C-alpha cells in the first residue's frame, strides 16, 4: 500500500478526534495535559508519526512518487486563504510557524491534488475559472465536516511553481477526485 493512502486514512482519524474536542477544552489545558500522541492504542501500522499542520482544515495529502514531497489541501486562514487551496511540503518540513508553498491559484476552491509520475507536476480540481471567490460552504452538521460538491470544478495540471500547464476537463459537472497511475 502506498504511503499516500496511509497518510489520508490517518488524517481522517486525526480529524475526527480533533473535532470531538471543543476549543474551550483545548485552550484550558496545557499541551502536556492534552493527548498529543498521534497514534491510537493498538495501532500496529503507523510509526514515527508527527503533526505537520497546525490549524485550518487540512486534507487530501498525497506523497510524490519518489516519497520526497507531499501535496495537500488546506483552508488555514493564517496562510492567507479563505477556502481550500493546494500546498506543497518537503518530507522533513512542519508548518507550526511558517507558511507552506501554495501551488494553486489562490482563487476559487481547490481539492483532490495528486502528483504526476514525473514528480514535477500535480493535478488538482478547482472552481477558479467559474468564480474567483470561494463558493458557498455547506453548513456543518452537528459539528461534522460536510464535503461540498460543486459542478464548477475542472481538473488542471500545474508545475511545482504553481503554473497551470494544462486543463484536462471543460464541462459542467463534478470534475474532481482524479488520481494517477504510476505507469
Q: Where do the language-model regions lie?
A:
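Polybasic, low-complexity, intrinsically disordered segments
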Residues: 1-19
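Multi-bladed beta-propeller domains
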Residues: 36-57, 89-109, 158-174
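Catalytic phosphate/metal-binding cores of nucleic-acid and nucleotide-processing enzymes, i.e., regions
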Residues: 63-65, 85-86
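Hydrophobic beta-strand positions that form the internal "hydrophobic ladder"
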Residues: 70-71, 122
Amino acid at each position: 500500500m502506498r504511503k499516500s493512502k496511509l497518510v489520508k486514512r490517518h488524517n481522517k482519524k486525526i480529524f475526527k478526534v480533533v473535532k470531538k474536542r471543543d476549543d474551550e477544552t483545548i485552550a484550558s489545558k496545557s499541551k502536556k495535559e492534552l493527548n498529543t500522541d498521534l497514534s491510537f492504542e493498538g495501532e500496529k501500522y503507523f510509526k514515527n508519526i508527527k503533526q505537520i499542520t497546525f490549524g485550518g482544515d487540512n486534507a487530501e495529502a498525497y506523497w510524490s512518487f519518489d516519497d520526497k514531497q507531499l501535496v495537500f489541501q488546506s483552508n488555514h486562514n493564517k496562510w492567507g486563504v479563505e477556502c481550500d487551496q493546494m500546498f506543497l511540503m518537503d518530507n522533513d518540513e512542519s508548518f507550526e510557524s511558517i507558511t507552506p508553498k501554495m501551488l494553486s491559484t489562490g482563487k476559487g476552491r481547490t481539492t483532490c491534488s495528486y502528483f504526476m509520475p514525473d514528480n514535477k507536476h500535480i493535478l488538482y480540481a478547482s472552481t477558479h475559472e467559474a468564480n474567483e471567490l470561494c463558493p458557498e460552504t455547506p453548513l456543518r452538521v452537528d459539528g461534522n465536516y460536510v464535503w461540498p460538491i460543486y459542478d464548477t470544478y475542472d481538473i488542471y495540471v500545474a508545475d511545482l511553481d504553481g503554473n497551470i500547464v494544462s486543463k484536462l476537463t471543460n464541462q459542467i459537472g463534478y470534475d474532481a477526485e482524479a488520481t494517477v497511475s504510476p505507469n
